[in-house]
Curated annotation (Swiss-Prot):
Protein name: Putative 8-amino-7-oxononanoate synthase
Assembly: Homodimer.
Annotated GO MF terms: 8-amino-7-oxononanoate synthase activity; pyridoxal phosphate binding
EC number: 2.3.1.47
One GO term (biological process): biotin biosynthetic process
Swiss-Prot/TrEMBL cofactor(s): pyridoxal 5'-phosphate
Pfam families according to UniProt: Aminotran_1_2
NCBIfam families the UniProt entry points to: bioF
Reaction catalysed by this enzyme: 6-carboxyhexanoyl-[ACP] + L-alanine + H(+) = (8S)-8-amino-7-oxononanoate + holo-[ACP] + CO2
Pathway annotation from the record: Cofactor biosynthesis; biotin biosynthesis
Length: 380
């Protein structure tokens, strides 16, 4: 035990020790240690998670005869229910693709897809800043991989050219909206690059984009009009869609490969049907939420401008707004100060972000008002 204790002490010395907070949620507010704070750290981008009208409308349609609260098994055994197929068909239809497949979480999706679709003779080329879950999936793939410089497509092209013909298949892996900087990948350029090389597939994680961007809330791929050109388009239900789970839209042949070879899918008890029914209910309504998307973008543009004015740094183009302070100590102190003023802001430190870029990750939601954001800015 002494070795584990020493590890924790080392983390504390570097201001990198983490703990799970005790929280009480009250709509867009958080109660912590008897302090009520506006939640500036949530991924509930459309503000749906505490929408009581939506919740009541969903519950009333069942009249007490609710879907099962557990699947009790993997979908490949006895854990499949009609609502799973209903949701997969709805997602595929909305994206105008052949098929969709559900997963228990975005993490399950990202650690399972690449190992299922690659061989030891494959190559993965991933953006330097992809999420930890994608990195874990790459490591589990046991094939060759390189990380290209963040959003540097000339570097990516050089890696594609250098390795052309050497591997049985190549996967380009990126997020659309990056979770810590809030910047956006150029999906059109990535599609163009992919098409220049044979046996090359594009895998895009839209976790922080689905619901928020695109005319129908289908993400950056919809906004860029490239949905049909992305081989594996992953999204999550646990952020803007106020639910749990994830999906991939892809060709039917890839779906069948995942069903047969993806270990996190095969060996996990499936999501509760009740949860999947709620997801279906929310996903049906995505096209109707344009007012929320427009309001969120107005809030985001204002906050990005104000933070950039103070720090001279603003990589973001989205509702994820990094307030980059640099060192751990300054970031921890500022987060504490903002919490004392009534704003639940959390410090993000290495190894989550590169050394010297510690920041407060500000995350806006559509149920906030412009006055609330202006009052927050006055505290910066």
């Amino acid at each position: 035990m002494d070795a584990f204790k020493q590890q924790l002490e080392q983390l504390s010395a570097k201001n990198q020790y983490r703990s799970i907070p005790d929280l009480v949620h009250q709509g867009r507010y958080i109660m912590r240690e008897n302090r009520k704070m506006l939640n500036m750290s949530s991924n509930d981008y459309l503000g749906l998670a505490s929408n009581e009208n939506l919740r009541q409308s969903f519950l009333q349609q069942y009249g007490g005869n609710f879907p099962s609260f557990t699947s009790s098994s993997s979908r490949l055994l006895t854990g499949n229910f009609p609502i799973y197929t209903d949701l997969e068909e709805l997602v595929a239809q909305r994206f105008q693709r052949e098929s969709a497949l559900l997963f228990n979480s975005g993490y399950h999706a990202n650690i399972g897809i690449l190992p299922a679709l690659t061989t030891t003779k494959s190559l993965i080329l991933a953006d330097k800043l992809v999420h930890a879950s994608m990195i874990d999936g790459i490591r589990l793939s046991q094939c060759e991989f390189f990380r290209y410089r963040h959003n540097d497509y000339e570097h990516l092209k050089s890696l594609l050219e250098k390795n052309a013909g050497k591997f049985d298949r190549t996967f380009i892996v990126t997020e659309s909206v990056f979770s810590m900087d809030g910047d956006v990948a150029d999906l059109k350029q990535l599609v163009q690059l992919k098409k220049q090389f044979s046996n090359t597939y594009l895998y895009v994680d839209e976790a922080h984009a689905v619901g928020v961007y695109g005319q129908n809330g289908l993400g950056i791929a919809e906004r860029a009009n490239v949905i049909a050109d992305i081989d594996l388009l992953v999204g999550t239900f646990g952020k803007a869609l106020a639910s749990m789970g994830a999906y991939v839209v892809c060709d039917q042949i890839l779906k069948e490969c995942l069903i047969n070879q993806m270990r996190p899918l095969i060996f996990s008890t499936a999501l509760p049907p009740f949860n999947v029914a709620w997801t279906h209910f929310i996903f049906e309504r995505l096209p109707q939420l344009s007012k929320e998307r427009t309001h969120l973008e107005q809030l985001s543009a204002f906050l990005r401008q104000e933070v950039e004015h103070r720090t001279q740094i603003m990589p973001s183009q989205t509702c994820i707004v990094p307030y980059i302070l640099g060192e751990n100590e300054a970031t921890l102190a500022k987060a504490k100060d903002l919490q004392e003023q009534g704003y639940y802001c959390l410090p993000i430190r290495p190894p989550t972000v590169p050394k010297g870029t510690s920041r407060i990750r500000l995350s806006l939601t559509a149920d906030m008002t412009m006055d609330e954001v202006k009052q927050f800015v006055a505290c910066l």
